[in-house]
Amino acid sequence: MSMKISVALAQVTQRQFTDDLSGYAEEIEKILSRFPETQMVVHPELHLFGSDMSTDALSDIAQSLDGKFVGELGEIAKRFGIWLIPGSIVEPAPNSEVYNTALVFNPAGELVSFYRKIFPWRPSEPFTMGSEFSVFELPGLGRVGLNICYDIWFPEVTRQLTWMGAELIVNLVRTTTPDRKQELVLVQASAIVNQVYILSVNAAGPIAMGRSLVVDPDGDVVEQILDDSNSIIYTIIDFDRVAQIRRDGTAGVNRMWDQFLPNDPEINLPIYSGRINPRTWRPGMNR
């Protein structure tokens, strides 16, 4: 049985917000006409919500998870029979605040997962923090974790997602600043130390810096866009590759998830008021 999924990462310019999603459906249709074998389409952070990051503007266009807008995104996924990650949306939060929330729809159009960005880029972003990590199942293939943009600067996020069983992590990005160069290093390092695939899809110019990429669980960059152009990465994710790297080791030598022996002592982590327990140090321990 194949353990692979074909994914199209759309590095494209952000769309201005509208509750008419016909233009977005046409955008997906064009991707699928170019890459008809695509099983999953991924767009960048806030792809459908324009570039105005003022609190008032975001509050005016915030969309609830059970509302018409999100429902229509599900209908688009169902229409094309694909897994769809349409970037993130602006979602209402308590006290008149807003979340930056990634959505995942299955080919039946069901909202199967969502993730509220835990690390907004302060002080520039007005979003309130999420508080829960998100990993979802691709039936018969593997598990996928979600993070958004600045989350990649915090290694705890990727480590937690991997511990929750993620073999593929989708990093939705709208980086408009020169530190995209450093983010590329962080994406590669995060894939290496967790032995996971990472798909990092940034928006295109003129707003964002582009340079989307795919890194495999050995840390190799297998696909990348070298500029901020409107471009598509079409890639195949092989979940067997994750198992192989974890079994044989990164570069054939490093097996971080097999580091501990059964009787090793716990390691206190005062920074987190917690600890590493050698008996639970492996991916998927809380599945």
Residue ranges and their predicted role:
Residues 2-9:
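Extreme N-terminal starter segment of soluble prokaryotic enzymes
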Residues 13, 47, 89-90, 149-153, ...:
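Catalytic metal-binding/acid-base residues of hydrolase active sites
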Residues 15, 22-108, 177-192:
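Cys-nucleophile CN-hydrolase/nitrilase-fold catalytic domain and related Cys-dependent amidase chemistry
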Residues 55, 103, 114-121, 213, ...:
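Short beta->alpha transition motifs characteristic of CBS
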Residues 65-83, 152-233:
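CN hydrolase (nitrilase-like) catalytic-core segments centered on the catalytic cysteine
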Residues 93-167, 173-185, 189, 247-251:
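Active-site catalytic loop in hydrolytic enzyme cores
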Residues 135, 203-287:
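C-terminal beta-strand edge segments of enzyme domains
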